[in-house]
Amino acid sequence: MLTEEEKLKIYAEFNKSRHWDYTDELIFDFLMSVYKESKPEDIIKLKKDFFFVEKDILKCMLSLEKLDIKPQYMSLYARRMNSKIFKTENPTIVFDELLQFTIKSFYLLVFSLANDRSDENFEKCFKNCVMLLELQGNRHELATYSYEKLVEMCKYPKNILDLSMDAYWVSWTFIVAHELYHVSNNTAESSYQEELDSDKYAYTVIINMIQAQKQGKTPKDLDVFHEYLYLAPLMMLEFFKLLDFYNNLFGKKAEYIDYPSPELRQEKLFDMFDEYIPDSFDTVEGNGVFNCFLDEIDFIKEQLKLKKENGELDRIREN
């Protein structure tokens, strides 16, 4: 039987990262041309370690949670909408790039639509949404874009970019904390209940990180754990609910047998609020962000259903 180290080596060999398709010079030029506030020293840090943000968050999380482990972090493109952990001597978290880019794109299109419901922006966001659901959600293929298209896509208002990326990092932290919980269990395969327990643990980590940032106990560079994003993990689960809704329009009903549904995962997280959300939390703004997010999801669902009925969705889907 293969050891966890051998499994990881094989997994990494057959699932190369997509990040290395780009040269350092291309990344540098892209960031400097798109983000006016980009600082050369920050980009130099990025060039030295592409995953320095992930590693900084992980280090902060381990310290706050007093976890006596030294996990490694890997980003690979295995075309799986998940993350996983290999229980090697130093546990290795593998975050699939399909999931990374899907969550980022999902937040950008939803928040962009909330900010601008003009016909032009709606058409762009709707097409991006269908592509996200069909290409990445169903076919598990990352979309590819030209350099010019990437620059165009990044011309979002700064507040939308900041909100989307902060929501992404909170969601990323939730997913990683979920995986770390599995390390404490010696079972070969995680159970249905263990998945829910992992969610519960991960959400307590999010609350602790938000509390720590309020108290000045997190690095200033990691200014992403805001009270108004305390519901980010639930926003992330909206993508999987939307994917199920989309597939149901085409007669494909989702079945959850060995793994809890996104609805159940949300329900269990909501059940934690009375006990785990501190009284000192200002939840008003966070509830507002979440409700605004849900309004856009409802609008997208209405448009998906409408365009399926008139045949337009099939045309968009095929292009």
Ranges and model annotations:
Residues 1-171, 185, 281, 287-319:
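Hydrophobic or amphipathic, alpha-helical segments that drive membrane association/targeting
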Residues 94-95, 194, 256-260:
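Preference for well-ordered, secondary-structure-rich cores of eukaryotic proteins
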Residues 105, 187-188, 204, 208, ...:
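Hydrophobic alpha-helical membrane-insertion segments
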Residues 165-174, 194-196, 219-233:
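Alpha-helical scaffolds flanking conserved acidic
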Residues 174-187, 199:
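Active-site recognition of the HExxH zinc-binding catalytic motif
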Residues 191-210:
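An active-site-proximal "capping" alpha-helix that borders the catalytic cofactor pocket
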Residues 207-319:
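Long, well-structured alpha-helical subdomains associated
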